Curated annotation (Swiss-Prot):
Keyword Acetylation: no
Positions that bind GTP: G34, P35, V36, G37, S38, G39, K40, T41
Quaternary data: Homodimer. UreD, UreF and UreG form a complex that acts as a GTP-hydrolysis-dependent molecular chaperone, activating the urease apoprotein by helping to assemble the nickel containing metallocenter of UreC. The UreE protein probably delivers the nickel.
Domain of life of the native organism: Bacteria
Biological processes per GO annotation: urea catabolic process
Pfam families listed in its UniProt record: cobW
Organism lineage string: Bacteria, Bacillati, Actinomycetota, Actinomycetes, Mycobacteriales
Family in the record: Belongs to the SIMIBI class G3E GTPase family. UreG subfamily.
Keywords carried by this UniProt record: Chaperone, Cytoplasm, GTP-binding, Nickel insertion, Nucleotide-binding
Keyword Ligase: no
Function as written in the Swiss-Prot or TrEMBL entry: Facilitates the functional incorporation of the urease nickel metallocenter. This process requires GTP hydrolysis, probably effectuated by UreG.
Localization per record: Cytoplasm
Entry GO terms, CC: cytoplasm
Gene: ureG
Name the record gives this protein: Urease accessory protein UreG
């Protein structure tokens, strides 16, 4: 397996980590996954801007060979630099969030130690396809982001991310007229494949706060922070 890096430093992932058990007082962890270009980093930035005055939060990004997403967040000053960390997976993006999560767990430990106390950690996956999901040992709940530019067929294609994520975000709704996508069809198909799990249609261009996605994150933090 290729080596992992945390903020550019080689990371030894060849040791065992127990399955995570949630304990009182630890930060809520929300995973954000989805294909390349769907708007994951833009959503992370929007959530940070909206929540940084009410919650103590940090962000952990995953990229294959670079720290591009973390660098973007730092350049835009969505949080202080010490609250943003990056894992370089060195291989398939879903490996580090599902199969061998050690580098992410260790980076989370570092964020917690450097920024006590934290209420929320957002964990962004590297760009992957519709099959990417997070390990339950890494996060509490997960958001999967797709975008309208792929056409209104995307939700009905399903896949683990679209079907089983705790929140499906259909992003870039402002592009629907340009690509001939029917938002009503996308919502209908999402509701059918997701069997009651929530779906949020957003446009960060038209609503930079991320609207329903922001409300969902706030609710998850409230609920999960009370679970001991």
């Amino acid at each position: 397996m290729p080596p992992h890096f945390i903020d550019g430093e080689p990371h030894d992932h060849h040791h065992d980590r127990p399955r995570r058990v949630r304990v009182a007082g630890e930060p809520v962890r929300i995973g954000i996954g989805g294909p390349v270009g769907s708007g994951k980093t833009a959503l992370v930035a929007a959530l940070c801007r909206q929540l940084r005055e009410e919650l103590s939060l940090a962000v952990l990004t995953n990229d294959i060979y670079t720290t591009e997403d973390a660098d973007f967040l730092r350049r835009h000053a969505v949080l202080p630099d010490e609250r943003i960390a990056a894992v370089q997976t060195g291989g398939c993006p879903h490996t580090a969030i599902r199969d061998d999560i050690t580098a992410n767990l260790d980076a989370i430990d570092d964020l917690i130690a450097a920024n006590p106390p934290l209420d929320l950690i957002l964990v962004e996956s590297g760009g992957d396809n519709l099959t990417a999901t997070f390990s339950s040992g890494l996060i509490d709940v997960q958001i999967f982001v797709v975008d309208v530019a792929g056409g209104d067929k995307v939700p009905r294609k399903g896949g683990p991310g679209v079907t089983f994520s705790d929140l499906l975000v259909i992003n870039k709704t402002d592009l629907a007229p340009m690509v001939g996508a029917d938002l009503a069809v996308m919502r209908r198909d999402a509701e059918q494949v997701r069997e009651g799990r929530p779906t949020a249609l957003i446009s960060l261009t038209e609503d930079p706060s991320s609207g329903p996605a922001l409300a969902w994150v706030r609710e998850q933090v409230r609920i999960l922070a009370d679970v001991h």
